[in-house]
Amino acid sequence: MGTWGAGNFENDTAADHLSILTDRLITEVADAMAGDPVEIEPDEYWGVAVPANLELLSLLARQGHVGASLPEAEVIEEWKRTYMAVWEGSIDGLMPSPGHKDERRTVLIRTFDELATLRRKEDSD
C-alpha cells in the first residue's frame, strides 16, 4: 500500500508506528492489571497510568488511523471489574471528599466504557 495520502498517518510507516504505540499502551495496562493489585490503587503510579493509557487509546482510536489497535471489549470489561474493585476497596483510605470520589468514579467508569464501545464499533464495521 505504501502511501495513500498526504497526512502524517497516511502511510505504512506511520501505521506501523501507531501500532507500536498502541501495543505499548495496551501491554502496560495488561501487565498492570495482571500484577499486584496494590500497584493499581488510586495513589499508585499504575492506578493513575492505567486510566490515562485507556483514554489515550480512545483518543487514538477516534482518529480512525490505520494501525491503531484496541484490546477486545471483553478484556476491557474484565479490566474495568478488576480496576474498579481495587479502586472501591482503597479510595476511602485516601479520605477524598464525597464529591471528588463520586466524580472520579464516574470518570473512571466512563473511561473503560468508552474504550469498550469503540472496540465494539470497530468489530461491527
Q: Where are each of the predicted segments found?
A:
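Short terminal alpha-helical segments
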Residues: M1-P42
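Amphipathic alpha-helical elements of HEAT/ARM-like alpha-solenoid repeat scaffolds that form extended
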Residues: G2, E10-T13, W46-A61, D92-G93, ...
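Charged, low-complexity interaction regions
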Residues: P37-Y45, H65-G67, D92-P96
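Amphipathic alpha-helical binding modules
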Residues: E78-D125
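Residue-level signature of the C-terminal ends
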Residues: R24, L59-Q63, L115-L118
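Helix-start/N-cap signature of alpha-helical segments
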Residues: G7, P42-V50, H100
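Short amphipathic alpha-helical heptad-repeat segments
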Residues: L21-V29, V75-W87
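HEAT/armadillo-like alpha-solenoid scaffolds in large eukaryotic assembly and transport factors
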Residues: G64-I76
